[in-house]
C-alpha cells in the first residue's frame, strides 16, 4: 500500500477475509486520511482468490485501469508500479505485467474494459485461465524488483521479509 500511495495510486480497495476485522483496524490506523476502502469476502474460507477479486472489482469506482496485488505480496517497489503504468498502451485494452527473469509477476495493471469479462469469468485456473484467453492483450515490462517474487504464505517467510526490509 505504501508503494502504491507513493506513486499516487488512488483509490485503493482492499478485500479482506481471514482476520479481516483485525487487519481493517490496522489499516485504518496506519492509513488514516487516505483513499483506502475495505470490502469483505465473508465466504473466504470456502471460495478462491477469483471470488475475492470479483468482490473488489464490484467495489471500485469507475477508472481507466487497476492494479491487482495479492495481500501476501507486500514489498513490491514503487518503481515497479511506475514501470508497469508507463508500459500500458493508451488506446488499446491491455493487461500489463511486470516480468522478472522472464516470468510474469504481480502486480498486473488491467484495463478497466476487462472488468465485465472478469466478473463473468468462471473458467478453470482462476485469472490464469482468463489471461490465457486474452494473450493478445498482454504487455510485459522487465523489472528488477525482488518484491515481485516475495510471497508471504508462511510465518517463516513473513519473518524473513520483516528481517530483510526492516532489518
Where do the PLM segments sit?
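Conserved N-terminal catalytic core of the sugar/cofactor nucleotidyltransferase
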Residues: 1-64
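Short beta->alpha linker loops
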Residues: 18-19, 44, 48, 79, ...
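Hydrophobic packing residues within well-ordered alpha-helices of enzyme cores
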Residues: 23-27, 84, 118, 161
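Active-site phosphate/pyrophosphate- and oxyanion-stabilizing loops and adjacent acidic/basic residues
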Residues: 25, 54, 82, 128-129
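Conserved beta-loop-beta/alpha segment of the NTase-like Rossmann-fold superfamily
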Residues: 37-38, 45-116
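Active-site donor-binding loop signature of nucleotide-sugar glycosyltransferases
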Residues: 41, 100, 112, 143-145, ...
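Conserved alpha/beta core of the MobA/IspD/sugar-nucleotide pyrophosphorylase nucleotidyltransferase superfamily
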Residues: 116, 120-167
